[in-house]
Structures are given as structure tokens and as C-alpha cells.
Design a protein with these regions (language model features):
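Amphipathic alpha-helical packing elements
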Residues: 111-143, 147
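Short, surface-exposed, low-complexity cationic segments
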Residues: 133-164, 168-170
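Acidic, serine/threonine- and proline-rich low-complexity intrinsically disordered segments
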Residues: 1-117, 159-214
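A generic structural micro-environment signature
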Residues: 125-128, 133-137, 149, 153, ...
Length: 214
């Protein structure tokens, strides 16, 4: 009986891998948690040269010639039989198994260490970092935030040397400005935006030099 169950598990893993090879990783259950991790892993890989694959698909830990990124869809499809089956149990494909497999294969501990999911701003406020893909395909660390919550912040934080992109919102959460240069924003676009905001929300504090109190 145990041998039959093991064979069924092996057949299931083979079928899943074949489906991925034929139709891509979209065949796998990717929830928000998995998508967010994959974006962070790709950001990490983009900004470190010690995390690539060579022609035979093996991982290399030194700077050298590489053909495709380890976290790319192309490589994940190519190597699916290596990273996915060890995490499949039974005959049900669960998102947690896919997440765990990717986390192990893409060295999630290093991703967590270098590409945080949250950040503390200079004014002491905790913010969630998103890793959004821009139109040109570049992944940027991004914070969507009401503009008053960055009052008292004058230097743009960075992740692996990349400035965080701020999507600034009005108190009603309407888009105001997008910037990755806070110092330039305060001296440039802010005076005109502030004038408009004061007219719409006269009871709010608009002194950007002082951090907003909770």
C-alpha cells in the first residue's frame, strides 16, 4: 500500500511538472504571497551579480557568464523538476507547497535579509514596501502613502541602493505625485500641491517640516 501511494505521488508530481513545462508557471497556484515573494526575489537577483544560472541550469555563487536569471519564468519552467517535486505531497497542488519550493530554490533567507517587506521611515512610521513592475519591466521598491505621513522625511530611503518610489496620495487617497527624490519633491512640486491641498483640506496640518503626530 505504501509503495502504491508513493507511486501515485510520483505520478502526480510528474504530471504537474509536465503541465508547467507545456503551459508555463501560470499553471501553478500563485496567490499574492507567492507573487510578492517572486517579485522580491527577482529584485534581489537583478541587483546582485552573485545569483545567476549558467547554461546547464546549475546555480553559481560567483560572478561569471550567465544566460538567464534563476528567478525568471524561463528558468523556473526549465528547472521545475528540480525545485518543485520535493515539496509536493499527496495528489493536491497547494499554494503553500509552491511558495515553500520557490522560497527554498531562490534562497528566500537572503531575499528576506536584503529585500524587506516593511521599512521604517525617518519620521518613525512603519510602511509596507511593494515591489511593483514598471511599464519598462523594471521592479521598483514602492510605497503608496498619504503625503502627510512622510512629513519630516527629507532623504529618500533605498533598498539595495535603489531609491524607493513614493506614490503620494491626498487625504482622500487620490493620487498627487510620484517621486523617488523626496528632497527634490519638497523644494519643487510640493509648494504648488500644498497650496491646492490647503484649499481643499483647510483643517489639516500642511507643514511638511514636522512629522505628523498619530
Amino acid at each position: 500500500a505504501e509503495r502504491r501511494v508513493a507511486a501515485q505521488d510520483e505520478d502526480f508530481a510528474y504530471a504537474v511538472c509536465r503541465a508547467v513545462e507545456k503551459n508555463g508557471i501560470a499553471r501553478l497556484p500563485f496567490g499574492e504571497k507567492t507573487k510578492a515573494f517572486l517579485a522580491r526575489a527577482r529584485f534581489y537577483e537583478t541587483h546582485t551579480r552573485a545569483f545567476r544560472t549558467v547554461d546547464d541550469g546549475s546555480a553559481v555563487s560567483v560572478v561569471g557568464t550567465y544566460t538567464i536569471a534563476k528567478s525568471s519564468e524561463e528558468n523556473l519552467i526549465k528547472t521545475v523538476r528540480e525545485w518543485l517535486p520535493p515539496f509536493l505531497t499527496g495528489t493536491t497542488l497547494r499554494e503553500n507547497a509552491v511558495y515553500d519550493a520557490l522560497y527554498y530554490y531562490l534562497d528566500g533567507a537572503k531575499v528576506d535579509k536584503n529585500v524587506p517587506q516593511t521599512i521604517v521611515l525617518a519620521n518613525g512610521k512603519f510602511c509596507t514596501l511593494l515591489y511593483d513592475t514598471a511599464a519598462e519591466g523594471i521592479i521598483r521598491p514602492t510605497i503608496e502613502i498619504i503625503v502627510q505621513k512622510i512629513f519630516g522625511c527629507f532623504e529618500t530611503p533605498r533598498v539595495m541602493g535603489v531609491p524607493v518610489l513614493f506614490k503620494l496620495l491626498s487625504p482622500a487617497r487620490r493620487p498627487l505625485q510620484i517621486t523617488d527624490d523626496l528632497a527634490g519633491f519638497w523644494s519643487g512640486a510640493w509648494p504648488e500641491i500644498c497650496k491646492e491641498m490647503k484649499g481643499r483640506y483647510p483643517k489639516h496640518n500642511w507643514d511638511y517640516r514636522a512629522a505628523e503626530r498619530e
